[in-house]
């Protein structure tokens, strides 16, 4: 380990500041571009090194005091030391850079980032871990727990649930998901206000009077049910049978929800999709919209091929991982035109970015 003085040049996706030292990149957490810092090299590889921040010698005007007493130890937040407007600018730039560097996409029509109305107290659920009497979150880049009494980015109801858990005399080792009272027990977005903005954005991007919507990775139908008025037929697919069961509750005749693997359903029988005993040729449907909201790993090669084979008129790609989005758009651009890419700040104070890409089939 050695101590070095560094000038931070950028903030990389993931939240760490980037400097150069002896010809290699050095990643330093809790820093801002333009800052002069003292850091201790803790891991050194051939092409890069990682360091811990020791002292900020020349601070950025965008540096602020974090609101959480656990910031810097807890692994949840990365940006509490940065004022909110600059957090938004960093995330927008990180998305643009990923599209250019990984996706080789030039002149992408990026829209302004949609901010969160709440910068703190926005999370409607958290998952805490309990071990040997300690209840909290994992430390940064560690499997060791840090004891947490409250979480400032979580709603008051969630923190009350955490306090109630901590008051129990005997808490078994394991993990506990604490929710707001109205929060469903299937997957949903953690920031209610930005989730609504996300849904409104997608509703605005989808043209009216369409024949078919396929909502892949649909969950409980958050997008599909908001779009019912624009389609004759709606099909949702998700591996989570509990989410599909929730989607089926009060579903109309035009809605069909399938518990299954997205790749298997989209590629079944050479481009056919089984729907309640019928087999419908989807590849011939031009008046079709496909929404894909995959996990952070992005699309498999099979799903990408199924999308190009289906050739939907409108394709909406919702992503929580700019690098995998960029990788997938690099392939999809051969069959689709990218109309817009819109980032949303679903997770203030963290390094996470939500993105919506709007594509249309090439004519």
Ranges and model annotations:
Residues 1-70, 142:
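Terminal RNA-binding accessory module
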Residues 54-66, 72-166:
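Extended interfacial segments that mediate partner engagement and assembly in macromolecular machines
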Residues 38-40, 127, 214:
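Hydrophobic beta-strand signal
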Residues 19, 34, 77, 321, ...:
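Residue-level signal for inorganic ion chemistry
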Residues 2-5, 13, 154, 168-363:
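Rossmann-like S-adenosyl-L-methionine
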Residues 31-38, 160, 164, 168:
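Short nucleic-acid-contacting surface segments enriched for D/E, G, S/T with interspersed K/R
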